[in-house]
């Protein structure tokens, strides 16, 4: 109804508007049979512009009036009637009226819905109509450009001869129909009448009809069609052309700017060419394009002055327009330039070169993390790295990071996007990538939130491509379970987790067994180049040479096939100058998983065996593949071993090392069944010769908790049970009635086989019985005899976890393991591990299980396990206890690591290692303060002094001095107690690398020095999680490298054990089986002293190469480096600090004070049995094995 009224009104308005116009010209033209042209000058003497203008105004006012009248009528006539009661007689009439209104309402609603669908962009018809309206609007605008190119504003021309007006009229008829459709679809008719696009129609449609009646044209306000350009962004979105916010914003800015510019130019053109009213005699002739030029120059505030407004109306409009136009120009143009300049800088799609691999790196992308990653990934020591590194991050790089990318532009590319968006994954071609690496923020405030974000990234990657290889960094060990439970996660396909907490604590744990080992391993998997200098100290040059060593893999040449591992290692070291650490042993069955075996006992090299080497570069390791006996046997210079032309590589030649088999006897396999045991106790004559044999026997079979055996090269092999029993009895007398449980031999088909065919040299100090200064009485490590009454060793059975890799005990409550200061002070702890833990009750869990588990590896005998004493907040430890309750020999002192009384109570001066850890979250305010507690604790211990009393400085008795004069005798096993805190073995965990300068007061480290070059790190007394950054690159290039490193530092954690722990139930105990007990027979880390014992001969001016060969042949131990005093002078102010030398050359001179890092075999030999009879009174001075380091539970070893 409203639309009909509008149509009628529109026609009447046109007629009424024309009634006042002069029709004489029109009539004369109509009467002219020849259709002669107008006399233009006579026609234009009378201006008719107001007719065109009034038609537009009247149309607007008429439409507005109709809408207002309709609303008033609806308000008066259609008011809501009051509800009538059910019995009211007018109710029927009301119902009929309502039904009629509902029918009309339904009809109007359907019409409105139809019109709405027709003009919306949601349907195909709507999209076509919207695009058609835009195209016709632009076509009408082009017609205006054509008409406005002349300087005439009003022109007399017969309509039938005016082609442009005829075309424009056809367009306007279409716009009029579209106007009515929009009017019907509008929910608020009054507001619709006041819309901008409605005014465009008011001032463009009616004048086209007026021109027919007057036979003249007025340029008028047709330039308003330019405002239709503002709909370009909407139309492009309807057509799915614009999808990103930046492109939509750019289209909006450009369309608004151009629309306003062209519209304002049309107004200036109209006003200047018309002149000022009322006589219009000062017209300023300007073309439309000149006006366009004039406006852009004016808006940009340049204003050349070559074009300007002369009319009053033109100038007035310009004044007001500049207030808007200048602001728009100043805001829009910079934003447009920014969007155009940066829109596609890091967008687009990866263009892969044919045959070139690429990896995608995401997660925590900053200058620091990226620079560390690229420094290691693109290191020159690697073989030609033909891999492109693609970084994907949601934020654009800052200037520093952008500069880094430019310096590596040939191998690095950055894309802006998120790993959670499949479109961005498609852009960087994740499905074609070689691997996807996820970096973590090591300094984050919330480690669990950081891990959750990275795990979600892995889920997104695996959801997009489930066969892509993923290597991820995680902060917390307990979050590893969520990752392992992802269905498409498969470690067999190369997926790997680098858990920073697990590896960090594992490195620290191994340093408890062999101080300095954390530094050695960290340097091995980091790619570094070393440069020695004569200006530097000798110890610095020795250390730097070791930092240049890395771990590589290479396939062994056919020359090695069939020879034992020890023999192959000797050949590599002496001939190729390579250190062979481990080999990959393939499964016996086809398709079975291969495993990495470190220093395997009795394994022989098979064809295509992959070896793990320590060397300076990948080129050096190639010698292992190039080596050929026929071509290279006589070559003395290892650098000359190159690829030969020998074709007979398939035939295995007999190596000159084959005659060494007699020096490498096959190791004895220890059966899992219960062995025969000999319990002997008695008195034997004490001549010195027999005592020497007894001491050798005891120390050969009672190994230290630090991980090495105690036998000597000169000891006698026991050939029968009786001799062994007598010797054990004498040993029992020697060590204060300690009753050993001896497994001297086992019977196999009537023959007696010795427990281990490798002799055992003594290792670094530890906690079992040694001589003290009072008459050679033993001072075993552990708890005093009066503290051991609660432990019944005969009735307790020792168990392992279900995999057989770790010692296990039934769950203990935390309260049973808590000591107060008095209880700790009454406990003579020795050879133990003190963990100084700084934590608040709500601090994030760091996973203390990862520190204790390597110290509970099953390749230690039970009595060798070091007691772990944790000093810290018991409220925090209670949260960790669920993961510690099944691990034996743990005590907790609820105290402060900064309290000297607490430190004295736990005998920190007698410990084998003091670990200083912090679980507190670093502050954002000042990151350097994150390590304040750890540094204070370290300096506090170094400033302490201790009494030189019994049990502090253990000295050798005279009888022992006589024994040690022979080649076969052991060294003093117990670490001498420290009188000064500076000599306490210590390792401090740091969050910030730069804080390492505060640990040692006697060094001259520069704050800008890299961590690995600082003295505390070189000495193995500091460790920071940043050194683990290199593992990402190492794991990518060598899938087995992380497995090897994890095996070395975790004590034997396997993927199967990881899956068990991922269940969340913790370690599960298991019955010993043949398979699980065989897992005990694996290599471990140890430290051997050259001061005394069977290897002492090499300490006096010996060479490292001779030591290496002798240790490998005689004891099956693989030497990997030295731990040497920094100051080798005997001056009184010489430092007691040692530093790490990784894999010295074979001609390297040794010193008696050196300690050797070794990978030693498992010793299944004689077990140690604590006494059943209490020691005589004297108590703490004659401490026996208790629940301290050597006691606390069962020590019955079913596999000995």
Swiss-Prot record:
Domain RCK N-terminal residue range list: 356-498, 830-974
GO cellular component: membrane; monoatomic ion channel complex; neuron projection; neuronal cell body; plasma membrane; postsynaptic membrane
Sequence ranges on the Extracellular membrane side: 1-48, 150-164, 211-214, 272-284, 308-316
Region Disordered, annotated ranges: 681-713, 746-785, 1170-1200
Keywords: Calcium, Ion channel, Ion transport, Membrane, Phosphoprotein, Potassium, Potassium channel, Potassium transport, Transmembrane, Transmembrane helix, Transport, Voltage-gated channel
Start and end residues of each stretch annotated as Segment S9: 828-848
Post-translation changes: Phosphorylated. Phosphorylation may be mediated by both PKA and SRC kinases, which activate the channel activity. Phosphorylation by PKA is however unclear. Indeed, although modulation of channel activity requires Pka-C1, it does not interact with the whole PKA holoenzyme. Moreover, modulation of activity does not depend upon phosphorylation of Ser-978.
Residue ranges, annotated region (Segment S8): 563-583
Region Segment S7: start-end pairs: 505-525
Motif (Calcium bowl): 988-1010
GO biological process: circadian behavior; circadian rhythm; male courtship behavior, veined wing generated song production; negative regulation of neuromuscular synaptic transmission; potassium ion transmembrane transport; potassium ion transport; regulation of synaptic assembly at neuromuscular junction; response to xenobiotic stimulus
Motif Selectivity for potassium location, chain numbering: 301-304
Keyword presence, Signal: no
Ranges in a coiled coil: none
Residue ranges, Cytoplasmic side: 70-127, 186-189, 236-250, 338-1200
Pfam family membership, one: Ion_trans
Entry membrane topology: Multi-pass membrane protein
Domain of life: Eukaryota
Biased composition (Polar residues): 746-776
Region named Segment S10: 1017-1037
Chain ranges passing through the membrane: 49-69, 128-149, 165-185, 190-210, 215-235, 251-271, 317-337
Complex formation: Homotetramer; which constitutes the calcium-activated potassium channel. Interacts with Slip1. Interacts with Slob, and, indirectly with 14-3-3-zeta via its interaction with Slob. Interacts with Pka-C1 and Src kinases, which can bind simultaneously to it.
Protein purpose: Potassium channel activated by both membrane depolarization or increase in cytosolic Ca(2+) that mediates export of K(+). Its activation dampens the excitatory events that elevate the cytosolic Ca(2+) concentration and/or depolarize the cell membrane. It therefore contributes to repolarization of the membrane potential. Kinetics are determined by alternative splicing, phosphorylation status and its combination interaction with Slob and 14-3-3-zeta. While the interaction with Slob1 alone increases its activity, its interaction with both Slob1 and 14-3-3-zeta decreases its activity.
Name used for this protein in its record: Calcium-activated potassium channel slowpoke
């Amino acid at each position: 109804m409203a639309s009909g009224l509008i149509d009628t009104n529109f026609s009447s308005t046109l007629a009424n508007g024309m009634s006042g116009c002069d029709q004489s010209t029109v009539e004369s033209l109509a009467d002219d049979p020849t259709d002669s042209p107008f006399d233009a000058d006579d026609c234009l003497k009378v201006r008719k512009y107001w007719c065109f203008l009034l038609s537009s105004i009247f149309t607007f006012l008429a439409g507005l009036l109709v809408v207002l009248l309709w609303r008033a009528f609806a308000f008066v006539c259609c008011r809501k009637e009051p509800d009538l009661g059910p019995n009211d007689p007018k109710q029927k009439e009301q119902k009929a009226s309502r039904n009629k209104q509902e029918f009309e309402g339904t009809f109007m609603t359907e019409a409105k819905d139809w019109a709405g669908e027709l003009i919306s962009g949601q349907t195909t018809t709507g999209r076509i109509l919207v695009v058609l309206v835009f195209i016709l609007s632009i076509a009408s605008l082009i017609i205006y450009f054509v008409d406005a190119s002349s300087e005439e504003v009003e022109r007399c021309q017969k309509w039938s001869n005016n082609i442009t007006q005829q075309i424009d009229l056809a367009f306007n008829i279409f716009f009029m129909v579209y106007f009515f459709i929009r009017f019907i679809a509008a929910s608020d008719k009054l507001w619709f009448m006041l819309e901008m696009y409605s005014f465009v129609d008011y001032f463009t449609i009616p004048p086209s009809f007026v021109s027919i009646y007057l036979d003249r044209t007025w340029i008028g306000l047709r330039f308003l069609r330019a405002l239709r350009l503002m709909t370009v962004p909407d139309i492009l979105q309807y057509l799915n052309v614009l999808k990103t916010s930046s492109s939509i914003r750019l289209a909006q800015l450009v369309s608004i700017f151009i629309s306003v510019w062209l519209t304002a130019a049309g107004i200036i053109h109209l006003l200047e060419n018309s002149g000022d009213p009322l006589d219009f005699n000062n017209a300023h002739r300007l073309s439309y394009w000149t006006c366009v030029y004039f406006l852009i120059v004016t808006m940009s505030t340049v204003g050349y002055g070559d074009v300007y407004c002369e009319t009053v109306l033109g100038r007035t409009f310009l004044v007001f327009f500049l207030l808007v136009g200048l602001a728009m120009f100043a805001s829009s143009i910079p934003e447009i330039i920014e969007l155009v300049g940066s829109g596609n800088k890091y967008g687009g799609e990866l263009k892969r070169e044919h045959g070139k691999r690429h990896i995608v790196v995401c997660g925590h992308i900053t200058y620091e993390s990226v620079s560390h990653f690229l420094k290691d990934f693109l290191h020159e020591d690697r073989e030609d790295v033909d891999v492109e590194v693609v970084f994907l991050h949601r934020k654009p790089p800052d200037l520093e990071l952008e500069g880094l990318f430019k310096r590596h532009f040939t191998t690095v590319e950055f894309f802006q996007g998120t790993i959670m968006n499949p479109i961005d994954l498609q852009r960087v071609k994740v499905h074609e990538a070689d691997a996807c690496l996820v970096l973590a923020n090591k300094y984050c405030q919330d480690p669990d939130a950081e891990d959750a974000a990275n795990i979600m990234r892995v889920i997104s990657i695996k959801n997009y491509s489930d066969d892509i290889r993923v290597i991820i960094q995680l902060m917390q060990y307990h979050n590893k379970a969520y990752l392992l439970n992802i269905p498409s996660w498969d470690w067999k396909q190369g997926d790997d987790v680098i858990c920073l907490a697990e590896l960090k604590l594992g490195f620290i744990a191994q340093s408890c067994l062999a101080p300095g080992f954390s530094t050695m391993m960290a340097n091995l998997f980091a790619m570094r180049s070393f440069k020695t200098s004569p200006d530097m100290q000798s110890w610095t040059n020795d250390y730097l040479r070791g930092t240049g060593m890395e771990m590589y893999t290479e396939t062994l040449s056919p020359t090695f096939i069939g020879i034992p591992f020890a023999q192959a290692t000797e050949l590599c070291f002496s001939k190729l100058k390579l250190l062979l650490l481990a080999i990959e042993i393939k499964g016996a069955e086809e398709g079975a998983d291969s495993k990495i075996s470190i220093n395997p006992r009795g394994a022989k090299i098979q064809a295509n065996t992959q070896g793990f080497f320590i060397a300076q570069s990948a080129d050096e390791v190639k010698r292992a593949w190039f080596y050929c006996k026929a071509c290279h046997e006589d070559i003395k210079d290892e650098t000359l071993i190159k690829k030969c032309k020998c074709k007979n590589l398939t035939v295995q030649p007999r190596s000159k090392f084959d005659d060494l088999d007699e020096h490498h006897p096959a190791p004895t396999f220890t059966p899992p069944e219960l062995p025969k045991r000999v319990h002997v106790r008695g008195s034997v004559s004490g001549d010195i010769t027999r005592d020497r044999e007894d001491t050798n026997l005891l120390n050969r079979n009672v190994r230290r908790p630090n991980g090495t055996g105690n036998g000597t090269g000169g000891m006698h092999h026991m050939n029968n049970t009786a001799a062994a029993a007598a010797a054990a009895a004498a040993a029992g007398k020697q060590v204060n009635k300690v009753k050993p449980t001896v497994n001297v031999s086992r019977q196999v088909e009537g023959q007696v086989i010795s427990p281990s065919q490798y002799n055992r040299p003594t290792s670094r100090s530890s906690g079992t019985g040694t001589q003290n200064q009072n008459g050679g009485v033993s001072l075993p490590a552990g708890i005093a005899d009066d503290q051991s009454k609660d432990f019944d060793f005969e009735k307790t059975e020792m168990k392992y976890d279900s995999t057989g890799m770790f010692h296990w005990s039934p769950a203990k409550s935390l309260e049973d393991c808590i000591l107060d200061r008095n209880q700790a002070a009454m406990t003579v702890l020795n050879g133990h591990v003190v963990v100084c833990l700084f934590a608040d009750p709500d601090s994030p869990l760091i996973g203390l299980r990862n520190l204790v588990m390597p110290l509970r590896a099953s390749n230690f005998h039970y009595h060798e396990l070091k007691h772990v004493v944790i000093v810290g907040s018991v409220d925090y430890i209670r949260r960790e206890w669920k993961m510690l309750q099944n691990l034996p020999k743990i005590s907790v002192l609820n105290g402060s690591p900064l309290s000297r009384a607490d430190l004295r109570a736990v005998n920190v001066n007698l410990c084998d290692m003091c670990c200083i850890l912090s679980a507190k979250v670093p502050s954002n305010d000042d990151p350097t303060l994150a390590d304040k507690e750890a540094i204070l604790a370290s300096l506090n211990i170094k400033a302490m002094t201790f009494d030189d009393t019994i049990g502090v400085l253990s000295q050798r008795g005279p009888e022992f001095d006589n024994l040690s004069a022979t080649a076969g005798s052991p060294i003093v096993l117990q670490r001498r107690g420290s009188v000064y805190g500076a000599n306490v073995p210590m390792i401090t965990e740091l969050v910030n690398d730069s804080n390492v300068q505060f640990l040692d007061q006697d060094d001259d480290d520069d704050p800008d020095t890299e961590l690995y070059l600082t003295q505390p790190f070189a000495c193995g007394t500091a460790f920071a999680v940043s050194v683990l950054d290199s593992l990402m690159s190492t794991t990518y290039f060598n899938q087995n490298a992380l497995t090897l490193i994890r095996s070395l530092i975790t004590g034997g954690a396997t993927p199967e054990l990881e899956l068990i722990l991922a269940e969340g139930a913790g370690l599960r105990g298991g019955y010993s089986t043949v398979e699980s007990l065989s897992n005990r027979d694996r290599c471990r880390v140890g430290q051997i002293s050259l001061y005394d014992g069977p290897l002492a001969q090499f300490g006096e001016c010996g060479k490292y190469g001779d030591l290496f060969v002798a240790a490998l042949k005689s004891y099956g131990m693989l030497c990997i480096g030295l731990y040497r005093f920094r100051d080798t002078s005997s001056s009184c102010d010489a430092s007691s600090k040692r530093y790490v030398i990784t894999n010295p050359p074979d001609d390297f001179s040794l010193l008696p004070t050196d300690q050797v890092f070794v990978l030693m075999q498992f010793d299944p030999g004689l077990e140690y049995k604590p006494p059943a009879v209490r020691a005589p009174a004297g108590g703490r001075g004659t401490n026996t094995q208790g629940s301290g380091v050597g006691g606390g539970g069962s020590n019955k070893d079913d596999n000995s």
